[in-house]
């Protein structure tokens, strides 16, 4: 009986002292604790207790085979910066620091050590400085969302060198300059472009015309000139928003893809007539207000179903839903 008790105690102690196949590594735990410290030890991360397993019960932490593969810190009272030790979580696949208005500083260069990262969400924060060129070293990245921050400077041309990227989502920042010429040479996927509400300007590179973008949103900038490169009868584009810019082209010359369901060209310097081809589209959203358009609105299709405000403030547009010609 005594032997049985001693053996039971021995194996119990042995089981406790052996590392669990589910527990995180010391390297990952230490990196997480340094990240927590850099974020000001917020109450949001109170479950990150150094005496417990970081793969079990730590808020926002996901693990696979004892390694941290997902980290999500969102919607909390966080005051601090992204620790350079984020790069020590080398198996990370998803990183989400979003809706953190007091998260400041830059994107640390050590993020380039995350070679397996496929999802990066850094949105609705106070991150600032330029979007670094080295972010293009994340070749596995599929989803990139840097929207609603305080980023300044130009769009890095190196973003075109990310072969798996499905969208360039850098809207609602303070970016300046023009669309890089390198965007005419994407090395892999043709990503959706979400560049709205920045301080971008200049003409769109003609080289973009060879691409079939699914969605383009350049609204709320200072772009000028033509925008033919986003259109084409044989393309499969679904959504185009060029509103609140200074685009200047003849609308009747534009060849529209039959796939377009949302088209906003309002508040530009677009002239000419509304082409009859627009009556063939299954539009859910349409706006050409505040331009220099003239002539009768083509009848048929869905154009007459939109509010008069979608056509308002042009030079001499007429016909339903506006006044008769």
From Swiss-Prot:
Subcellular localization: Cytoplasm; Nucleus; Cytoplasm, Perinuclear region; Cell membrane
Tissue expression summary: Confined to flowers and inflorescences (e.g. inflorescence meristems, floral meristems, stamens and carpels).
S-S pairs: none
Organism: Arabidopsis thaliana
LRR repeats by residue range: 65-88, 89-114, 115-140, 142-162, 163-185, 187-211, 213-233, 234-256, 257-280, 281-305
Protein name: Leucine-rich repeat protein FLOR 1
Self-association and partners: Interacts with MADS domain transcription factors during flower development. Component of a complex made of FLOR1, VSP1 and AGAMOUS (AG). Binds directly with AG.
PANTHER family for the chain: LEUCINE-RICH REPEAT PROTEIN FLOR 1, POLYGALACTURONASE INHIBITOR 1
Gene designation: FLR1
Annotated GO CC locations: cytoplasm; nucleus; perinuclear region of cytoplasm; plasma membrane
């Amino acid at each position: 009986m005594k032997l049985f008790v001693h053996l039971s105690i021995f194996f119990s102690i042995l089981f406790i002292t052996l590392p669990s196949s589910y527990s995180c590594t010391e390297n990952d735990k230490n990196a997480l604790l340094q990240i927590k410290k850099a974020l000001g030890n917020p109450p949001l991360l109170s479950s990150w207790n150094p005496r417990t397993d970081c793969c079990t019960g730590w808020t926002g932490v996901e693990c696979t085979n004892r390694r941290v593969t997902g980290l999500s810190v969102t919607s909390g009272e966080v005051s601090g910066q992204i620790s350079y030790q984020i790069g020590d979580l080398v198996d990370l696949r998803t990183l989400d620091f979003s809706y953190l208005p007091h998260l400041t500083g830059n994107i640390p260069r050590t993020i380039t050590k995350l070679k397996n990262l496929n999802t990066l969400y850094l949105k609705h924060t106070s991150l600032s400085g330029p979007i670094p060129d080295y972010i293009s070293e994340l070749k596995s990245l599929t989803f990139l969302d840097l929207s609603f921050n305080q980023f300044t400077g130009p769009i890095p041309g190196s973003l075109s060198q990310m072969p798996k990227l499905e969208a360039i989502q850098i809207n609602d920042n303070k970016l300046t300059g023009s669309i890089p010429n390198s965007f005419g040479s994407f090395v892999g996927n043709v990503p959706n472009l979400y560049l709205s509400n920045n301080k971008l300007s200049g003409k769109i590179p003609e080289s973009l015309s060879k691409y079939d973008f699914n969605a383009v949103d350049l609204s709320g900038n200072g772009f000028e000139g033509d925008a033919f490169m986003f259109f084409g009868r044989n393309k499969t584009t679904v959504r185009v928003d060029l509103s609140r810019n200074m685009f200047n082209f003849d609308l009747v010359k534009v060849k529209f893809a039959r796939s377009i369901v949302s088209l906003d060209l309002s508040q530009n310097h677009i002239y000419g007539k509304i082409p009859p081809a627009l009556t063939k589209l299954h539009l859910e959203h349409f706006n050409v207000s505040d331009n220099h358009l003239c002539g009768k609105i083509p009848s048929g299709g869905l154009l007459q179903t939109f509010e008069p405000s979608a056509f308002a403030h042009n030079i001499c547009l007429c016909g339903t839903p506006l006044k008769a010609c």
